[in-house]
């Protein structure tokens, strides 16, 4: 075994390191290889081969610094020549003719501001007004939060590169047996994939601080280049074609790097990839071959977002772009389990301080729900934020407007779906008072009905949804777990769309929260229970095919044997107790008349069910006008027949059958009734006098 010691010529002068006390010094005057000279101020290296001897002398001052110790600690001075030769040829070297020097061309408008514009400081953010629009400099708000300590890069890189002292943000995910780790630094991004078949490291950015150990050269690992950055690929030859096929087809990588300087184009690219992944049913599959490709694009998106496009941009556009970034974070977290780390942009948190009186800095368009947008941005911080009551009021109004627009079975627009996606995320993540939480879940869940299911299916089949937000459906609400495979089959079969049922179930499995911990009244329910939960202000109704929760229950008896409907009422402050038996019962009441004066049945829900198909839809009634619209025979919204029936689930926990008599609301005021009675009395009195005269 030959002893091989690699000598590194350090070009930095001695005074570049910490001061050293040199006890002696000497000029380097070598003899010949037969008579080497040993000097006190030098370290002498003698290298012997078969027919040659080489002598190197290095001044001790170059080897006395901390960094030198780190460098020598990073190399193996006892490695055999045989192992060394094997190591040299083990790694994949990209073909030189494929290393294109890509020239990214920004595809969107770049904003330039007059340099004389003085900023207005709003909550520590510099705002630049120009022609009625406020701008911020992207570099000031998109700074990623890096750890305070030096980053520990993957152990597999120790063989190839010297230690790098740099701060970074790190996030790790598990997919089956694979582990995906992203490292983000101000200069470069690393995606490290650990796989039983072999690891892969992709490093993109300004890699001038990355120094490879002999015999490796950085140029041997360059896979692609742009004008400013390199993409390094470190993977063994025997692994690349078996495990990481997307690298062999470099089209995806080339297209990604072509857009690397344009964040919005990258976000659009990821949205398209995410939607394709959903529609193929590949999300959450541990053997999905496209996960490495998705993780690479995810890393490029965040790296470019935090380092590119540093100039001015309208505030609203900055916020909408960050909204889209959070939506892909949400999607990836649903598809791939996060085990460690998070990515934060602390300056964006400053926008959460804005109240409705400050919204003119963001937009003057009153139709945009700024409160919803800002509160959605807070989902990245979970419980570490406080949302003001003014924002919650604004959010409640936004949701109420969408509900009133579509409560009577009209198709949701893309804009509505995007807003509902944000509202659902807010309801499922941001802590709020129980009243608000229940109200949001109720309205979002009640927008799921057969019309919405058919509309959603047609939208998915047409592949028209442009991003991962407006592909959302309220049927993914955690309170609508009754939307099961069999329920979708029932609805889609009537519309001849049953062939798309599996796609919709995949979407629901991704977008529906795994539990109901935010709703105290039903948090004990198993996620596998096919139950609908109606969280009214003072009572919660759970509609299920069996007994699942402690409460006052009612069994519907008009259905066929194969269809079972059990309605359980749980008072507001009751403790959630899961059960499989009847705890207490109540009778079904018959509703004969509804007064238009007191609106006893406002804040209640009208439920439609079929004797064969079971529960179909629910409509929350807020006020008397909505009740009149719903029950007006001319609107054909309630059409009872021998199979279809309607129940009114009242705010006090009672359940009423709505007969045809009950559907006709008494809309006559008490004053008119008195007038009619007086007229009738006068008429009768006149008739009496007429008879007497005869």
From Swiss-Prot:
<feature type="glycosylation site" description="N-linked (GlcNAc...) asparagine; by host">
    <location>
        <position position="24"/>
    </location>
</feature>
<keyword id="KW-1169">Fusion of virus membrane with host cell membrane</keyword>
<feature type="glycosylation site" description="N-linked (GlcNAc...) asparagine; by host">
    <location>
        <position position="652"/>
    </location>
</feature>
<dbReference type="Pfam" id="PF17488">
    <property type="entry name" value="Herpes_glycoH_C"/>
</dbReference>
<keyword id="KW-1043">Host membrane</keyword>
<keyword id="KW-0261">Viral envelope protein</keyword>
<dbReference type="GO" id="GO:0044175">
    <property type="term" value="C:host cell endosome membrane"/>
</dbReference>
<comment type="similarity">
    <text>Belongs to the herpesviridae glycoprotein H family.</text>
</comment>
<keyword id="KW-0812">Transmembrane</keyword>
<feature type="glycosylation site" description="N-linked (GlcNAc...) asparagine; by host">
    <location>
        <position position="76"/>
    </location>
</feature>
<keyword id="KW-1168">Fusion of virus membrane with host membrane</keyword>
<keyword id="KW-0730">Sialic acid</keyword>
<feature type="glycosylation site" description="N-linked (GlcNAc...) asparagine; by host">
    <location>
        <position position="384"/>
    </location>
</feature>
<dbReference type="InterPro" id="IPR035305">
    <property type="entry name" value="Herpes_glycoH_C"/>
</dbReference>
<feature type="glycosylation site" description="N-linked (GlcNAc...) asparagine; by host">
    <location>
        <position position="538"/>
    </location>
</feature>
<feature type="glycosylation site" description="N-linked (GlcNAc...) asparagine; by host">
    <location>
        <position position="51"/>
    </location>
</feature>
<feature type="glycosylation site" description="N-linked (GlcNAc...) asparagine; by host">
    <location>
        <position position="573"/>
    </location>
</feature>
<dbReference type="Pfam" id="PF02489">
    <property type="entry name" value="Herpes_glycop_H"/>
</dbReference>
<keyword id="KW-1032">Host cell membrane</keyword>
<feature type="transmembrane region" description="Helical">
    <location>
        <begin position="672"/>
        <end position="692"/>
    </location>
</feature>
<keyword id="KW-1039">Host endosome</keyword>
<dbReference type="GO" id="GO:0019064">
    <property type="term" value="P:fusion of virus membrane with host plasma membrane"/>
</dbReference>
<dbReference type="GO" id="GO:0020002">
    <property type="term" value="C:host cell plasma membrane"/>
</dbReference>
<keyword id="KW-1160">Virus entry into host cell</keyword>
<keyword id="KW-0325">Glycoprotein</keyword>
<dbReference type="InterPro" id="IPR038172">
    <property type="entry name" value="Herpes_glycoH_C_sf"/>
</dbReference>
<feature type="glycosylation site" description="N-linked (GlcNAc...) asparagine; by host">
    <location>
        <position position="206"/>
    </location>
</feature>
<protein>
    <recommendedName>
        <fullName>Envelope glycoprotein H</fullName>
    </recommendedName>
</protein>
<dbReference type="GO" id="GO:0046718">
    <property type="term" value="P:symbiont entry into host cell"/>
</dbReference>
<dbReference type="GO" id="GO:0019031">
    <property type="term" value="C:viral envelope"/>
</dbReference>
<comment type="subunit">
    <text>Interacts with glycoprotein L (gL); this interaction is necessary for the correct processing and cell surface expression of gH. The heterodimer gH/gL seems to interact with gB trimers during fusion.</text>
</comment>
<feature type="glycosylation site" description="N-linked (GlcNAc...) asparagine; by host">
    <location>
        <position position="593"/>
    </location>
</feature>
<comment type="function">
    <text>The heterodimer glycoprotein H-glycoprotein L is required for the fusion of viral and plasma membranes leading to virus entry into the host cell. Following initial binding to host receptor, membrane fusion is mediated by the fusion machinery composed of gB and the heterodimer gH/gL. May also be involved in the fusion between the virion envelope and the outer nuclear membrane during virion morphogenesis.</text>
</comment>
<keyword id="KW-1162">Viral penetration into host cytoplasm</keyword>
<feature type="region of interest" description="Interaction with gL">
    <location>
        <begin position="174"/>
        <end position="234"/>
    </location>
</feature>
<keyword id="KW-0732">Signal</keyword>
<feature type="signal peptide">
    <location>
        <begin position="1"/>
        <end position="16"/>
    </location>
</feature>
<dbReference type="InterPro" id="IPR003493">
    <property type="entry name" value="Herpes_gH"/>
</dbReference>
<feature type="glycosylation site" description="N-linked (GlcNAc...) asparagine; by host">
    <location>
        <position position="337"/>
    </location>
</feature>
<feature type="glycosylation site" description="N-linked (GlcNAc...) asparagine; by host">
    <location>
        <position position="365"/>
    </location>
</feature>
<keyword id="KW-0472">Membrane</keyword>
<feature type="glycosylation site" description="N-linked (GlcNAc...) asparagine; by host">
    <location>
        <position position="411"/>
    </location>
</feature>
